[in-house]
Amino acid sequence: MALSFDSLTAAQIAAGVAAGDFTATEVAQASLAAIEAREGGVQAFLQVAPELALEAAARVDADRAAGKSLPPLAGVPLAIKDNMNLVGTRTTCASRMLGDYQSVYTATCVQRMLDAGCLPMGKANMDEFAFGSSTESSAFHRTNNPWDTERVPGGSSGGSAAAVAAGEVALSLGSDTGGSIRQPASLCGVVGFKPTYGAVSRYGVVAFGSSLDQVGPFGRTVEDVALAMNALTGAGHDPYDCTSQDCAVDFTEHLNDSIEGKRVGIIPAFMEAEGLTPEVKAAVQRAAQELQNQGAELVEVDLPHLDAAIAAYYVIGPAEAFSNLARFDGIRYGYQEEGCANLSDQSSLSRAHGFGAEAKRRQMLGAYLLSSGVYDKYYYAAQKARTLITQDYDAAYAKVDTILMPASPRTAFKFGEISDPTQMYLSDLYTISLNICGNGGISVPLGLGEDTQLPVSAQLVGPAFKDRQLLMFARALERGFADTVTGAPALSVAPDFAGKGGEL
């Protein structure tokens, strides 16, 4: 009986390639077949890279044939968010502004995954320049949620989440500025991890908010995400990124340790927040009960300044975005308006026609917030709020080891259902504060919601650079929900896509 590629985790694929059960080339071909069979329904990719994938697979197979030791993720198919440079592909940020831009170097995070043996299957769709929570702002096409193709996959890393949920790849990379890994992971029913700020190099990743952005992995299981973190951090500090920290540890070492006696924080106000749906609330309450059943102590904690997080984020984020996107001027590279009489017209018209509505909105807001007379009033206040929120978390972590909360206030919504940008911003209600303070957070699937029968998740957050401990708690939660969706790799692929193409 043929083995379905999407029934295997990244760990199982790497083990199978190392053991000779199948070749890396066979895995690459299976992933490409799955993409061909499923992509029409999910539209997770902006560019598929069969040549790069097969070349990488051939190198893995040649090394094995020569008796060389294989890297830990040898033969594992990987999707890469399209704001990360990879030589041999375009890096468009899902924007007309960079529609034809060819990567001239490879991002450190991508290179480290390739060095670990991953096969680059292509570039995943996203919200334009990572501005959004639904992947609807992509200039090229929408990405559909594999659990219901009339609903959004979340964003901005929607393509990365959907590619894993549809079983097209085993791992993917995303970036998280305000929840852009954890929220789509929640809506698509996969594991999504935002490490501590500085844990993963951002060199070669097109910047949105430089003090907020962090790269992280998506996978079907917590173990797969831990293996990806080993690859992303194993080489230590990246000299090309001044924020990069040397935090190389084996993220799998204590993954299955008991959490008995550990303390899990619960924020009562978060569970009563406006917009939190009953099915998500019930799922998170079940998660708390499961952790308690495994011996953890539930402790109420207070984060009194958290209600300022969204306001602070939408000052700091747009201000940094305005600065970062000023380089896209239509002169040096990117979209260039034709027929302009002078450089001023070329720059202004190229930006007017190259950027989409949300990208313009964020930059206009940033320009206003950085203007004379406004900067002192709002930007300083936002930075003060940032300090207070960080202090709140530090005080909480003096009492608990991790904090449990929702990852998203609701399950996946239908395309066009949320048209008001300010309402869309509330999709990141539970995730933004982690980018404000820089701590790690992970979205863990809890099965399907009672009302919508769509994926629901819980989020676990932890102190800075305690990411290995955070993964241990995530694995404990995953064990507790193994009979629903989480922990059963074959079931973590959306049923409408499972088994379509991709036989090994």
Where are these regions (language model features)?
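An N-terminal boundary/leader segment
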Residues: 1-54, 276, 280, 286-289, ...
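Serine-dependent amide/ester hydrolase catalytic core
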Residues: 14-18, 272, 305-306, 327-436, ...
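Short alpha-helical scaffolding segments that buttress acidic/His motifs in well-ordered protein cores
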Residues: 27-31, 312-313, 359-367
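Residue-level signal for inorganic ion chemistry
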Residues: 31, 53, 106, 225, ...
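Structural helix-boundary/capping segments
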Residues: 37, 115, 166-171, 177-274, ...
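Long amphipathic alpha-helix in the N-terminal Rossmann-like dinucleotide-binding domain
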Residues: 51-61, 117-118, 127
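Immediate post-signal peptide segment of exported/extracytoplasmic ligand-binding proteins
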Residues: 60-76, 255-267
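Short glycine/serine-rich loop/turn segments
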Residues: 73-215, 267-269, 318-319, 405-422
